[in-house]
């Protein structure tokens, strides 16, 4: 699920790829997911951050006013698209850094029944 507390959410704001409806109508933070889980009798057992470079790629593309399905979109052109090879390398590096730091835009949560009391 998208992580609204992430670096990508803060950096890209309204251009953040995860805000692109209808894929995600609600976005959470790790804390809001813990609260929601607790309210419904679950506990968060594990949180993993597993963003892919495309999150930054498409967020940056939106910032540059290039729609997802535009002819020059990365979605249609891949490495021959709107970004230099050096930019794509940096997006990959930044994604690895954010995942390792727990500050990435995508999180995977494992929930278990019970509060663990």
Where do the PLM segments sit?
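A C-terminal cap/extension of S-adenosyl-L-methionine-dependent methyltransferases
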Residues: 48-117
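Alpha/beta-hydrolase-fold catalytic nucleophile elbow
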Residues: 1-2, 50
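Secondary-structure transition into beta-strands, especially the periplasmic turns and strand N-termini
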Residues: 38-45
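Short loop segments at secondary-structure junctions
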Residues: 31, 41, 113-117
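Conserved acidic-Pro-Pro-aromatic motif
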Residues: 12, 27, 43, 50-51, ...
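Short, glycine-/aromatic-enriched active-site segment of Class I SAM-dependent methyltransferases
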Residues: 2-26, 31-38, 60-62
